[in-house]
């Protein structure tokens, strides 16, 4: 059954992707299927996301890392237990958000924007996720004291911040 | 008139380091905004400064309640890249450690529910029953939280006849206590009054947001990794997936209790049918260049690890995602429309793990 679903997914992906791509699939000893896809046109990620949505799938997580002078994103998407890993290289440090298509990508996109400073186009709520506004984006990899990295630094500082915000709203 | 109130680490309603901005109209929550990041520690970056064996220790310390699943999923990724085949015995032992953790973790969350609804005798009763699991952990693995059961190519512990007998005896002690407590959680009027119809997550929202674990299963969504993408010995020890349709706090409570029962069954089955063989390979493996993605079902839901290596001693990139990370946004669906006094109960019902989420 999984094999048939895999064939359908692959056929649909091939049908929708406009640019060049590399595609392979693997099966482990327990019969779990993973599809590995590399896209050469970064815009194609929107088409892939649409395929996932049409099959009732979800975004599990997106891994970002730096390779030489550019960033690479690996999208991990799931359709009923089949994992689809999609690699996209970002030479202009910009990527289209798939959150409007797959809500489940919301946080992970905000996180790579924050940690790696990757520009995100079309995200409905591109607010900071973990780090304080005073810290520059793309911080992962730089040394920073824990007290500074944490939003509140200490409970009393956090409390003072919230209190001042509250009073600001009232006036 | 609307009122804005903050709930967070400085407020009596919530012990967790998260800040909720709540808009109220009367007693009803209209809108909720969540701010996190208080305990972000940059562990993901740290993992890339440590070698493959040091990372066993580091991943175990991401969080205490899922502390077995982190190294478990991590070693599976390393093994996949290195092409290591783990023995059947080791796979069974991995399942034993994992299910013991699941029982203890679920029971902790459920006792917190009793605490938050002010049913303190029930909380004590649940925690006392849970002590049996803590005793098992301490006796077998030497620790009450971090069990350090997994290593690359197998497990670090073995079970002899005496230990198996001890675990079985303690589970026989636990089960009748669990049955008694379950009855209270399922039927007592105080519990029902505070949980039925509270914090509803409809099935379509659960699917849309990609929630996992008991949060998903409480809304009738089955994405249990043990069944959807089996690993270790789960393909042999057939897991019965527990599903509830209600989508409210009560449904999630029921899922967890029924899973406790199912895990007791799994532990019994695994230790009584333990295959013979080595528990770990003799030789330390070389980890070549490659990439792998592995998943496991932590007590809170799906945990996924992505590992990329380049042939050196340390990972080139390691990224993981914990269940709470996905369940968080569902709170925006669950909380509005409920009473202010229910916020902490709803929040607890996703079994939040903030240290995992922020890493």
Give names to the regions the model predicted.
Chain A
Residues 1-171:
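Terminal low-complexity/charged segments
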């Amino acid at each position: 059954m999984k094999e048939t679903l895999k064939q359908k997914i692959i056929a649909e992906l091939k049908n929708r992707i406009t640019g060049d791509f590399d595609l392979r699939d693997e099966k482990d000893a327990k019969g779990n299927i993973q599809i590995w896809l590399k896209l050469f046109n970064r815009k194609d990620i929107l088409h892939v996301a649409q395929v996932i949505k049409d099959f009732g799938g979800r975004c599990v997580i997106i891994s970002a890392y730096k390779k030489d002078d550019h960033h690479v994103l690996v999208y991990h998407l799931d359709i009923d237990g089949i994992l689809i890993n999609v690699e996209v290289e970002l030479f202009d440090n910009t990527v289209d958000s798939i959150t409007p298509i797959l809500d489940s990508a919301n946080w992970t996109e905000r996180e790579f924007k924050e940690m790696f400073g990757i520009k995100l186009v079309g995200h409905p709520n591109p607010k900071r996720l973990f780090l304080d506004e005073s810290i520059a984006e793309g911080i992962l990899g730089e040394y920073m004291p824990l007290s500074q990295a944490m939003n509140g630094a200490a409970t009393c500082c956090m409390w003072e911040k919230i209190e001042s915000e509250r009073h600001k709203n009232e006036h | 008139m609307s009122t804005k109130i903050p709930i967070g680490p400085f407020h009596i309603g919530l012990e967790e380091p998260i800040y909720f901005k709540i808009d109220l109209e009367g007693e009803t929550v209209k809108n909720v905004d969540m701010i996190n990041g208080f305990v972000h520690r940059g562990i993901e970056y740290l993992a890339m400064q440590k070698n493959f064996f040091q990372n066993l220790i580091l991943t175990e310390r991401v969080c205490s309640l899922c502390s077995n699943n982190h190294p478990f999923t991590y070693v599976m990724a390393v093994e996949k890249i290195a092409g290591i085949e783990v023995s059947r015995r080791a796979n069974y032992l991995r399942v034993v450690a994992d299910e013991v953790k699941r029982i203890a973790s679920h029971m902790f969350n459920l006792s917190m529910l009793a605490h938050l609804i002010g049913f303190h005798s029930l909380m004590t009763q649940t925690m006392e029953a849970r002590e049996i699991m803590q005793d098992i952990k301490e006796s077998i693995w030497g620790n009450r939280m971090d069990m350090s059961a997994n290593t690359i190519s197998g497990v670090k512990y073995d079970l002899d006849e005496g230990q198996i007998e001890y675990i079985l005896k303690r589970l026989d002690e636990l089960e009748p206590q669990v049955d008694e407590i379950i009855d209270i959680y399922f039927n007592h009027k105080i519990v029902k009054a505070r949980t039925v119809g509270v914090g509803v997550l409809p099935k379509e929202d659960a699917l849309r947001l990609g929630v996992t674990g008991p949060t998903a299963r409480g809304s009738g969504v089955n994405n249990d990794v043990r069944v959807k993408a089996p690993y270790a010995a789960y393909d042999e020890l057939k897991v019965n997936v527990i599903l509830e349709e209600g989508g409210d706090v009560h449904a999630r409570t029921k899922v967890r209790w029924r899973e406790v029962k199912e895990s007791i069954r799994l532990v019994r089955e695994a230790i009584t049918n333990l295959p013979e063989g080595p528990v770990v390979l003799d030789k330390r493996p070389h980890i070549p260049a490659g990439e792998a993605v592995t998943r496991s079902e932590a007590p809170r839901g799906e945990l996924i690890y992505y590992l990329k290596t380049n042939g050196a001693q340390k990972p080139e990139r390691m990224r993981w995602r914990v269940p709470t990370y996905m369940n968080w946004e569902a709170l925006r669906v669950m909380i509005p429309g409920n009473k202010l006094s229910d916020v902490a109960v709803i929040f607890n019902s996703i079994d939040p793990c903030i240290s995992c989420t922020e890493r």
